[in-house]
Amino acid sequence: MPKVECFEIPSLHCWFWSNDHDPPHFHVKREGEWEIKVKFAEGEEEMFEQQWGDTPSGKVLRQLKKAVTRHRAALLAEWEAKVNQ
């Protein structure tokens, strides 16, 4: 379970699953509260997919969207290196 390295958001765990499927995405979890998938090569409407638990706050979703926008190229490079090995 390789960690997303190009950015960090306090209190969130961000990672890739090795040998995961397209489209490029990573998982984000707030321990004991929720987990979502963040699709970073897709349009905004399809960016977040709830996995379990409560819905993340608007503030958290905005932080993730900003991080993805800033680090999209690095996320794609990490996806290729860690997932499509």
Per-region residue spans from a language model:
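Short, charged/polar N-terminal "headpieces" of proteins
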Residues: 1-24
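Context-gated lysine
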Residues: 3, 29, 37-39, 59, ...
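Alpha-helical structural elements
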Residues: 10-12, 47, 74
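A short, structured beta-strand/loop element
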Residues: 17-58
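Well-ordered alpha/beta subsegment
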Residues: 52-85
